[in-house]
Amino acid sequence: MLNTNVFCRPFDDLSDPLVKKEAIFAGKILEIAENKEIEILTSDILYGELSLISDQRKRDIIFNEIENVSQRKIKISDEVHNLAADLTGLVGDYSDSLHISFAAISNCDCLITCDRHLIKIKYKIESFLISKGLELAILTPEEFAESFD
């Protein structure tokens, strides 16, 4: 599962070297997905965040890319809500907790994100999920894309 920021990264300020690098790897992941080498799941939170993009053209381009690579859309459930509520104290942001919960509950291998805070606390998140009987790796676009080289 891809966090919203991975889909958006190619449209961000690429003058920042880290953002540019993330955009390149995000593009590689989307290419891998378009070639059907991986399965991309989407979620209600992804589409909810997408609706917040004020630039209509950017939103339409990202929406089309999501629709192009998505294999299946995961709907919100009580299980997702409950896990997100439990995670929010650790993560600090309910939307991020929802992304993690959707990915974990739907048995994704990983959540790919450019969110520096989530990357910083990824081992805490992964340990918390293990304590709940769930497994999910939190990866940067680079970490994921390099596993295909």
Where are the regions that the model predicts?
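Anion (oxyanion) recognition and catalysis
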Residues: E34, E67, A104
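Active-site neighborhoods of divalent-metal-dependent phosphate/nucleic-acid chemistry enzymes
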Residues: Q71-I112, R116-K120
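Anionic, Ser/Thr-rich low-complexity intrinsically disordered regions
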Residues: I38, T42, L46, S54, ...
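Short, solvent-exposed polar/charged micro-motifs at secondary-structure junctions
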Residues: E49-I53, N82-D86, S147-D149
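Short, solvent-exposed loop/turn segments at secondary-structure junctions
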Residues: V6-F7, L46-G48, H117-I119, F144
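Short, well-structured N-terminal submotif of metal-dependent ribonuclease cores
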Residues: M1-T42, L52-D60, I125-F128
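Acidic, PIN/NYN-like endoribonuclease modules and their adjacent C-terminal/linker elements
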Residues: D13-A23, S106, C110-D149
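Short, contiguous strand/loop micro-motifs
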Residues: D16-P17, E49, N68, A85-T88
